[in-house]
């Protein structure tokens, strides 16, 4: 049977120490609980304070809010008014600046125009003085300028044409023009009908002026200078005998045909027959000098002459090779 062990009896000191220890532990636990309770109470108080504050914020009246809105609106209106005043001031400054700039520009334009007029007056006076020159040659530059202006306006050379002479006196002394259409027994000193030119023969008035560069291709008789002065200028009728004797007509006609076959100078259309009087004129008709006849024919024929005429050939005789130039 097991033996029973008896607990030894505690001494008084040990019993008091154990009692103290237990009491301290209890006290410590109670303090901890109290601290926890205090913390919980503090938290609850803080929570209540937050709730109260929130409730107070929620309890704020609508009038206070309206008052705040009115204050903000007044502040905004003041800012807008200040902005408007600044804008008006800026506009005024810009307008004044524009007026000042226009005034300066107008003053500058006035000064520039005045200076330009003054310089133009001085330049014109200097130019007139340089043009006048010395007193001895005062009128000469103006005359030369007028002459140059006239040359520029009217060309270097002006040709004056006139109607073709209707009288046979213009061709007096030239044996080639002795066979005009008229009475068989008419003399050269009497008036005869004008020679019959081509259907497209141009007629010009005495007052009409033709410039030299453009006159030559326009008139069909103003061509290049021909080597002969006695060219036939129209259609003539070879049926009139004139001053030839009947015995020599046949031989002269044969010579003329032979010459027409040999020559290489012909018109664009056909060779016009020439009267035998042009080859073998009467001895009485050759009494007048040929030089005045040429001058008279050139002056009265109505054809415009150039400043440099072509070479003049003497009258063709029977001994020379007969070549005829027809217009």
Swiss-Prot record:
The modification Asymmetric dimethylarginine is found at residues 312, 323. Residues 253-271, 317-327 have a biased composition (Polar residues). One of its GO terms (molecular function) is transcription coactivator activity. Its main location: nucleus. Residues 14-109 form a coiled coil. The modification Omega-N-methylarginine is found at residue 323. Keywords: Activator, Coiled coil, Cytoplasm, Isopeptide bond, Methylation, Mitochondrion, Nucleus, Repressor, Transcription, Transcription regulation, Ubl conjugation. Disruption phenotype: Embryonic lethality. Embryonic fibroblast cells show reduced corepressor function of the N-CoR complex for PPARG, leading to constitutive activation of PPARG target genes and spontaneous adipogenesis of the cells. Conditional knockout mice lacking Gps2 in B-cells show developmental defects at multiple stages of B-cell differentiation, caused by of aberrant activation of 'Lys-63'-linked ubiquitination events and altered gene expression programs downstream of the misregulated signaling pathways. InterPro entries: GPS2. The keyword Repressor applies. There is a cross-link at residues 45, 71 (Glycyl lysine isopeptide (Lys-Gly) (interchain with G-Cter in SUMO1)). Key regulator of inflammation, lipid metabolism and mitochondrion homeostasis that acts by inhibiting the activity of the ubiquitin-conjugating enzyme UBE2N/Ubc13, thereby inhibiting 'Lys-63'-linked ubiquitination. In the nucleus, can both acts as a corepressor and coactivator of transcription, depending on the context. Acts as a transcription coactivator in adipocytes by promoting the recruitment of PPARG to promoters: acts by inhibiting the activity of the ubiquitin-conjugating enzyme UBE2N/Ubc13, leading to stabilization of KDM4A and subsequent histone H3 'Lys-9' (H3K9) demethylation. This is G protein pathway suppressor 2. It comes from Mus musculus. The lineage of its organism: Eukaryota, Metazoa, Chordata, Craniata, Vertebrata.
């Amino acid at each position: 049977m097991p033996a029973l062990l008896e607990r030894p009896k505690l001494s008084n000191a040990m019993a008091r120490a154990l009692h103290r220890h237990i009491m301290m532990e209890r006290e410590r636990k109670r303090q901890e609980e109290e601290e926890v309770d205090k913390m919980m109470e503090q938290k609850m108080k803080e929570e209540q304070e937050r709730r109260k504050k929130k409730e107070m914020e929620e309890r704020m009246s609508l009038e206070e809010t309206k008052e705040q809105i009115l204050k903000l609106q007044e502040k905004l209106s003041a800012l807008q008014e200040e902005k408007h005043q600044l804008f008006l001031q800026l506009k005024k400054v810009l307008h004044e600046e524009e007026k000042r700039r226009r005034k300066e520009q107008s003053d500058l334009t006035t000064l520039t125009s005045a200076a330009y007029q003054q310089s133009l007056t001085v330049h014109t006076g200097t130019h007139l003085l340089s043009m006048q020159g010395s007193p001895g040659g005062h009128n000469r530059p103006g005359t030369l300028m007028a002459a140059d202006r006239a040359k520029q306006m009217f060309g270097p050379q002006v040709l004056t044409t006139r109607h073709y002479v209707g009288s046979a006196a213009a061709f007096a002394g030239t044996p080639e023009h002795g066979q005009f259409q008229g009475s068989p027994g008419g003399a050269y000193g009497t008036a005869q009908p004008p020679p019959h030119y081509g259907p497209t023969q141009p007629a010009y008035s005495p007052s009409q002026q033709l410039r030299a560069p453009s006159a030559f291709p326009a008139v069909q008789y103003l061509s290049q200078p021909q080597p002969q002065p006695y060219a036939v200028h129209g259609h003539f009728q070879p049926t009139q005998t004139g001053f030839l004797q009947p015995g020599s007509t046949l031989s002269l006609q044969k010579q003329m045909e032979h010459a027409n076959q040999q020559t290489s100078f012909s018109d664009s259309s056909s060779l016009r027959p020439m009267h035998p009087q042009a080859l073998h004129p009467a001895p009485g008709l050759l009494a007048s000098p040929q030089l005045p006849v040429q001058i008279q024919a050139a002056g009265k024929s109505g054809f415009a002459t150039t400043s440099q005429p072509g070479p003049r050939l003497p009258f063709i005789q029977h001994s020379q090779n007969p070549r005829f130039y027809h217009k």
